[in-house]
Structure formats: structure tokens, C-alpha cells
């Protein structure tokens, strides 16, 4: 069973997706093999760029412009990629970011809640090292879709190695792996198509290189704004009664007569990857192998 019933549904979905933005990262690229391990000054810190569906990347300046001057704390109830929450953190506000999806939660823990923890070069080499004890779930269940030959096994290996980490280091690694799986040459940035058009063409070596870059970028985004920011993973109806803030920002999934964006199905691969599909059951007759929700 395909995610979209008609071509019109698929087109509506794609029209909601922001195009990926290029990031000028020459300063960090020049330091090949050396991760940023301490806080960068604001003018040296890279922008947080995302191509997550519905991202307000292009609107963060407008959102800040319309934020009242006396606001000191903000709740982002559907944080998604975390781009708005991160913007508010850079402005010195206390941020409470919430999202039901695990990938979004790990992203928020990595760059919103996290104040000073970063991956080291040794951590990165460990994550990319061979692991004969790694599982084969991705290789066994997603063969031929989403990624080029050899990448499925590499994802299994990196994911197994991530379990050797704890705390914010693990969040950074999961965030980086998810971002790497979403991006690359080809593909739509999500996992709604099993056709060749939905397959990323990167070789295993190119995947490793992008994973390294994503770790470097995330490391560089980590900073302490002097406020206790928090990431949560709760149903919004449970989350809101528990928190207090000067401002509440709401950007929920959109449902219209033309489209109902199901983020969990669109990003089912990275969502499953966050727990290595523990407790999840794949829909075997689905071409995209999404799990039951």
C-alpha cells in the first residue's frame, strides 16, 4: 500500500516541502578531521539549515520581528526540525521545545537543551568503525529502496555504534545520522516513495563524508545561552498543561482538503532508526516498508 492514493496527493505533499538550502561551511571544512569541541562566538556559528517538511527556515527573521520585546521564555509545541526553537535560543530566550516524533526530540536535545556537550574526533571514528556485532535490520528489510548498494549495511553499523554513546552525545549522533539519511544526491528528503526517484544515489564513502559533515555542523551549533532550555517528547495535550512561558508558538501539521501530511509516515525510516525499530511492526505489503501506526 502506497502512502499516496493519487498523483494529486503526491504533488500536494511535495509542494509543502521546502527546498534544501546550501550552507556556507568553508570555515569548518578547512578543518578536515578536526571537530569543533568548544563553543563558537555567535558570528562564527553556522546557521541551522534544514529541509524538513514544513520548516520555517525562510521565516525565522519574520517570526522574530513579530515577537514582543518583553518575551523571555517561549514554548514551541510542535518543534519539528527545531529551526524556530533554535532561533529563539540564539536570541537569549528560555526555550521549551516539544514534538511527538523521536527524531525531532533528539534534534531538540542535541541543539536546544544541550549546552556544551559535543562529539570528539575519537567519537566520530568509533561511530564509523566496522562492527561485526551490528544488526542487519536495514540491510534485510530495505534492500533496493531509499539508498544505493552498500549504504544499508553502513547505516546498520553506525546505528549499532551509536548505542555505545550516552546522553547528549547519543542525541547528536542520532540527529546526524537521521539528517544524513534524509539528504544526499537524489531522493525527496523523506521516505514516501520506493521508486528510483526516491533513492539517494550516494555511495557508502559519500554517505560517510556527509555524516562527518553533519556531525561537524551539529557540534558547531551547540552553545549555552545562559537559560535552561528543555526538549520534550509528549502529546501536545499532555505537554501544554505542564509548562509555563511568556509566548507559545504553534505550527502543527496541516490538514486540508488537498493534503493531510503524516510526518510519521513521511519520515518512517528515520523514526524507526531512532530505536532501531524496537517494538515496531513493518507493514510487509507496503512498498516503502513503513511501520504500523
Role assignments for model-derived ranges:
Residues 2-75, 83-84, 90:
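S-adenosyl-L-methionine
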Residues 70-72, 92, 170, 244-245:
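A general structural motif
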Residues 132-149, 155:
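PRPP-dependent phosphoribosyltransferase catalytic core
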Amino acid at each position: 500500500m502506497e502512502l499516496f492514493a493519487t498523483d494529486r496527493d503526491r504533488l500536494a505533499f511535495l509542494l509543502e516541502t521546502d527546498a534544501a538550502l546550501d550552507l556556507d561551511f568553508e570555515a569548518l571544512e578547512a578543518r578536515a578531521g578536526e571537530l569543533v569541541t568548544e563553543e563558537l562566538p555567535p558570528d562564527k556559528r553556522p546557521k541551522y539549515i534544514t529541509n524538513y517538511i514544513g520548516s520555517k527556515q525562510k521565516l525565522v527573521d519574520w517570526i522574530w520581528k513579530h515577537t514582543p520585546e518583553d518575551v523571555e521564555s517561549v514554548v514551541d509545541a510542535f518543534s519539528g526540525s527545531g529551526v524556530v526553537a533554535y532561533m529563539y535560543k540564539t536570541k537569549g530566550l528560555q526555550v521549551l521545545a516539544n514534538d511527538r516524533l523521536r527524531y525531532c526530540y533528539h534534534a531538540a536535545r542535541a541543539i536546544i537543551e544541550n549546552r556544551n556537550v559535543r562529539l570528539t574526533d575519537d567519537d566520530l571514528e568509533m561511530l564509523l568503525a566496522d562492527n561485526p556485532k551490528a544488526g542487519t535490520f536495514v540491510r534485510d528489510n530495505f534492500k533496493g529502496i531509499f539508498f544505493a548498494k552498500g549504504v544499508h549495511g553502513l547505516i546498520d553499523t553506525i546505528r549499532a555504534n551509536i548505542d555505545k554513546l550516552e546522553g547528549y552525545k547519543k542525541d547528536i549522533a542520532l540527529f546526524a545520522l537521521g539528517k544524513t539519511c534524509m539528504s544526499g544526491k537524489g531522493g525527496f528528503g523523506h521516505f514516501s516513495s520506493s521508486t528510483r526517484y526516491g533513492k539517494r544515489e550516494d555511495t557508502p564513502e559519500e554517505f560517510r563524508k556527509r555524516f562527518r559533515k553533519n556531525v561537524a555542523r551539529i557540534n558547531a551549533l551547540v552553545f549555552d545561552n545562559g537559560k535552561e532550555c528543555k526538549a520534550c517528547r509528549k502529546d501536545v495535550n499532555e505537554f501544554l498543561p505542564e509548562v509555563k512561558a511568556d509566548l507559545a508558538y504553534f505550527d502543527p501539521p496541516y490538514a486540508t482538503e488537498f493534503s493531510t501530511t503524516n510526518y510519521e509516515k513521511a519520515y518512517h525510516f528515520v523514526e524507526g532508526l531512532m530505536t532501531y525499530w524496537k517494538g515496531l511492526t513493518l507493514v510487509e505489503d507496503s512498498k516503502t516498508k513503513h511501520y504500523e501506526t
